[in-house]
Amino acid sequence: MVLRDKMILLDENTKAIVQGITGRQGSFHTKKMLECGTKIVGGVTPGKGGQNVHGVPVFDTVKEAVKETDANASVIFVPAPFAKDAVFEAIDAGIELIVVITEHIPVHDTMEFVNYAEDVGVKIIGPNTPGIASPKVGKLGIIPMEVLKEGSVGMVSRSGTLTYEIAHQIKKAGFGVSTCVGIGGDPIVGLRYKEVLDLFEKDDETEAIVMIGEIGGGAEEEAAKFIEKMKKPVIGYIAGQSAPEGKRMGHAGAIVEKGKGTAESKMKALEEAGAYVAKNISDIPKLLAGILGK
């Protein structure tokens, strides 16, 4: 078997810092990331420089952390009111990939840092995301590695817990995951479905893709236009098939307005684009078996 040295987003060359490492969530998830082999080379909390968290050195600024560790990625566990500044600081320090776990970030703040990142060519995952995970390399974020097994299925989702459930079903059926990407449940996010699908399309380790969508917005319809041009098989599943109009379901992005963003319209768009559409979660492993011939 060829050793994989380059996967999508997260690979053997990823060296990450954790912004907000001394907080409860930051500290807890730093330990989890280290346990699965992720290279966490530093942490940042202003005023806490010089400390250690699980053996990881803490710095006062991202600039200082990057200078000392050559970090190229950051995971952000900073509270919502300070998240925008944390992202800007990471971008200005030369970080190339930023995973924003924080939820409840004001939409205008997100728009500002997403636009800034796009202007300078920095990849942002999130906000309000479980992050990314590659069983062979580790994870940036909070995805529980227990649900993942190494394999050739790429996963991309707007939901967190639903991703874990589907990953677990895929594992139980004997299949594994190349990379799992949570794009985030907010109305505005950094990398969208189509960008992640494009990365999977070019990834040698990925043979098939499972895309988990949900009601609200037009992200899945936008993805469907890209799926039309893809060579690799895509299985689509849309959560919220019984959701009433006008009611927000879980995520800020999950709301059906005036007949737009319904599960029905999304499933139709995916089907017309040539994707395999799973009506239930239990259909996903069956469809994978048909596609991958196992």
From Swiss-Prot:
It catalyses: succinate + ATP + CoA = succinyl-CoA + ADP + phosphate; GTP + succinate + CoA = succinyl-CoA + GDP + phosphate. The active site is at H251. PROSITE patterns: SUCCINYL_COA_LIG_1, SUCCINYL_COA_LIG_2. GO terms for cellular component: succinate-CoA ligase complex (ADP-forming). Keywords: Ligase, Nucleotide-binding, Tricarboxylic acid cycle. CoA binds at T22, G23, R24, Q25, K48, I101, T102, E103. HAMAP family: Succ_CoA_alpha. This is Succinate--CoA ligase [ADP-forming] subunit alpha. The gene is sucD.
